[in-house]
Amino acid sequence: MFLLYLFTSFAAVSGVLGSSPSYNGLGLTPQMGWDNWNTFACDVSEQLLLDTADRISEIGLKDLGYTYVILDDCWSSGRTANGTLVADKEKFPNGMSHVADHLHNNNFLFGMYSSAGEYTCAGYPGSLGHEEEDAEFFASNGVDYLKYDNCYNKGQFGAPETSYKRYKAMSDALNKTGRPIFYSLCNWGQDLTHYWGSDIANSWRMSGDIYPQFTRPDSRCPCDGDQFDCAYAGFHCSIMNILNKAAPMGQNAGIGGWNDLDNLEVGVGNLTDDEEKAHFSMWAMVKSPLVIGADVNHLKASSYSIYSQASVIAINQDPKGVPATRVWRHQVPQTDKYGQGEIQFWSGPLDNGDQVIALLNGGIKPRPMNTNLEEIFFDSYLGFEQLSSNWDIYDLWANRVDNATSANILNNNSVGNATIYNATALSYKDGMAKNDTRLFGTKIGSISPDGLLNTTVPAHGIAFYRLRRST
């Protein structure tokens, strides 16, 4: 009954708002930015945030769209006698307003963190029961984004309505401040968040915490396969584990409210280049937030060239806002040392009539893979124009910035003469309308109504294409 109420109320609200499906007008495309947790955890400071922001700007990532700088847990030293949150003066000697001002003056947006519990996950003061005063603290300090966790929640979970009410309290408090604040739930998908998240928030985590492994199982992430409704979400979840859990959820996300598959592990740990490309591509394709988890001051050239791949980012920022669908998934006999091995095909519509597709190889050996128009346009039927048209195939990674150019940018702390896309000067939407070639990849062939798209996909890798109707 609660879920039926949510669907009914959302439909009514949508009818009133009309022009925007977002509950607060934010999140019309998935958020992009940087969060300190994956690399630095509690080792946070004013200097870290400001130096990171400067670096993101200097190497062109801000102009690619990575505009949120998000301070995660461990920033507080407690509360005053009247209950107001206090920033740790050793870590943040000039206070949070100073951080916000510096970021805003450099065209960034400032994110902070709390938990819908008595404490945060690291044991600092949480916001459960303090929603209004904490929302006012965030607003008065110029915060533009709140990541809201799920630790120490005093048992207030176990049914969708219970979790919904706990998270709605902060949603209402943020809205009451009058400041536009992007609201990012981090409740690990507990209590079917994908059903009710968009009613009160702009994004919601849908699994346990990620770690930089492509397929490796971990007992601390107990649910596997397509088990998206986990009683215990855990942490140390691999990239493929999270992706498989997300597969059925795309139908519940869209403009204003996004499934969050967790921060990006590109440049974190020891993922291969093919694994990092597949990870970034799939997060982009399912319209997950693109939040950098790496130390951008010590980024490999190859990882930088992934984060700066505008043709892939354009898939994520496509104004149609429709997450791709997994069309098929098959196990393969060539498994890795963890017993993991599978192949998948994903497809999704784009704003201008294009289609994005991915052939994903989770096996340990390079593999010939193919697809056809019936699979690509899986919801079409005989007689549909999509199935009777010829389509040009564009490789979304073929125009990737080479490692030498990337290294030069990183070493010189400047984009210089490199042709890195600038979404500040020309948005992805406008760039696509103007047919900016950097957003479409490189044409490699075409497919006819009765043809096959054939390719060889590397181990733990991806073939990632945009299809455009032939003219």
UniProtKB/Swiss-Prot annotation:
Q: Where are the transmembrane segments?
A: none
**Signal sequence bounds:** 1-18
What domain of life does the native source organism fall in?
A: Eukaryota
Keyword vocabulary terms for this entry: Disulfide bond, Glycoprotein, Glycosidase, Hydrolase, Secreted, Signal
The biological process GO terms on file are:
carbohydrate metabolic process
Major site of localization recorded for this protein:
secreted
Q: Which InterPro entries match?
A: Aldolase_TIM, Glyco_hydro_27, Glyco_hydro_b, Glyco_hydro_melibiase, Glycoside_hydrolase_SF, Melibiase_C
Q: Where in the cell is it found?
A: Secreted
Annotated substrate binding sites: D72, D73, K147, R205, Q251
Q: Which residues form the active site?
A: D149 (nucleophile), D209 (proton donor)
Look up the record and report any one GO term of the cellular component aspect. extracellular region
Which EC class, in a word? hydrolase
Catalytic reactions on record: Hydrolysis of terminal, non-reducing alpha-D-galactose residues in alpha-D-galactosides, including galactose oligosaccharides, galactomannans and galactolipids
List S-S links within the chain: C42-C74, C121-C151, C221-C237, C223-C230
Kindly list the GO molecular function terms attached to this UniProt entry.
alpha-galactosidase activity
| Positions annotated with a glycan in the UniProt record | N82, N175, N270, N403, N412, N417, N422, N435, N454
EC assignment: 3.2.1.22
The similarity comment for this entry is: Belongs to the glycosyl hydrolase 27 family.
Assembly and interaction partners: Homotetramer.
- Under what name is this protein listed? Alpha-galactosidase
Protein source organism: Saccharomyces pastorianus (strain ATCC 76529 / Carlsberg bottom yeast no.1 / CBS 1513 / CLIB 176 / NBRC 1167 / NCYC 396 / NRRL Y-12693) (Saaz-type lager yeast)
Which gene underlies this protein? MEL
